[in-house]
């Protein structure tokens, strides 16, 4: 499996800023916190998504993981793989593969796809960033070994100074992390989102539960108003017949952040020009009031950000 987290990447935020490099003090007040979740519940497999924009990113994106948007700027985590992990024939010391080598990135880019900042994250074998999320003050990023049941560093990044701060370390591959509100505990998912975690701000594990859903592996998540989060991701299924390729089933899910129970989910059949499901890599959702916008970077290396919008929703 690849990164297997929740990086929306889907990242979902209903907060915006007015300054160029994200002054948290300039955040506009949150409006209609529950509207996002209610609008999302109107989506189905029959929802029409219209592509509004394609922004070619003017830098090597490597293997994108998670994304969030603050004002007019986009923040995207990515892993640059220098040496791919190799599967063992038999597990060794509890691991199923080598560590590999790589570099963790948090890219900042503008609406024209121009790279403004490349923040390096990670240490040693922990070089694989996961899904990211903005809590109204800081961006939270997990950086793990590129293998399950391993180790992770949890950072928060000040979008004003662009400086990362290590918050704690934990003994599992954390594929994505977000904060429950600006001051709440941290919600996280493991490799393939098979396990849900709740941490306090110092890294103490408050709860650890199995994910009951096997529809998709959450790739990226972010808050969607009060008490809710939206996650995006994929699962790879075998093709029928003689094909040796994998079919990428994409999807979105709305979860209750307190109980981690699914409130609504739907498949996403949109694909990129390279044939990847758009929820394969980072996804960010934005509630416009009348519609929902979906920002996605599904392809590696030479990537484009694809922007879709739903038809008008009934927001009464």
Residue spans of the language-model regions?
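Short, conserved, GDST-rich strand-edge loop motifs in beta-rich repeat architectures
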Residues: 77-101, 144-148, 233-249, 302-308
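Residue position within the beta-strands of beta-propeller blades
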Residues: 76-77, 141-142, 188, 231, ...
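Beta-propeller blade signature
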Residues: 93-112, 152-160, 245-259, 307-315
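A short helix->beta-strand "capping" segment at the edge of beta-propeller domains
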Residues: 34-60, 117
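A short beta-strand motif characteristic of beta-propeller blades
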Residues: 51-57, 114-122, 163-168, 204-210, ...
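Short coil/turn segments that connect the beta-strands within blades of beta-propeller domains
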Residues: 71-72, 136-137, 182-184, 226-228, ...
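Loop/turn-rich, solvent-exposed surfaces of beta-rich toroidal or solenoidal domains
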Residues: 214-261
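Repeated scaffold domains used in trafficking and secretory/extracellular systems
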Residues: 62-66, 124-131, 171-181, 214-223, ...
């Amino acid at each position: 499996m690849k990164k297997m987290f929740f990086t929306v990447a889907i990242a979902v935020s209903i907060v915006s800023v007015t300054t160029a490099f994200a002054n948290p003090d300039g955040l506009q007040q949150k409006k209609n916190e529950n509207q996002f979740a209610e609008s999302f519940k109107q989506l189905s497999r029959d929802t029409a998504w219209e592509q509004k924009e394609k922004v070619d990113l003017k830098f090597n994106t490597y293997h994108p993981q998670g994304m969030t948007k603050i004002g007019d700027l986009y923040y995207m985590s990515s892993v640059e793989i220098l040496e791919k992990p190799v599967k063992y024939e038999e597990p060794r010391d509890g691991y199923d593969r080598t560590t590999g080598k790589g570099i963790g990135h948090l890219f900042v880019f503008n609406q024209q796809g121009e790279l403004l900042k490349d923040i390096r994250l990670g240490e040693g074998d922990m070089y694989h960033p996961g899904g990211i999320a903005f809590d109204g003050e800081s961006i939270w990023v997990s950086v793990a070994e590129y293998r399950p049941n391993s180790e992770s560093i949890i950072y928060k990044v000040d979008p004003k100074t662009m400086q990362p701060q290590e918050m704690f370390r934990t003994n599992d591959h954390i594929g994505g992390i977000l904060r429950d509100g600006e001051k709440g505990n941290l919600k996280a998912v493991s490799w393939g989102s098979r396990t849900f975690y709740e941490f306090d701000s110092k890294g103490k594990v408050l709860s650890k539960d199995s994910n009951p859903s096997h529809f998709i592996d959450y790739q990226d998540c972010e808050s969607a108003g009060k008490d809710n989060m939206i996650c995006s991701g994929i699962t790879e299924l075998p093709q029928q017949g003689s094909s040796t390729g994998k079919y990428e089933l994409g999807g979105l899910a709305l979860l209750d952040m307190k109980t981690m129970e699914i409130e609504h989910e739907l498949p996403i059949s949109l694909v990129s020009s390279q044939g990847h499901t758009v929820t394969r890599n980072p996804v960010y959702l934005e509630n416009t009031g009348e519609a929902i916008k979906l920002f996605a970077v599904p392809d590696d290396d030479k990537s484009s950000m694809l922007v879709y919008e739903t038809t008008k929703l009934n927001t009464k």
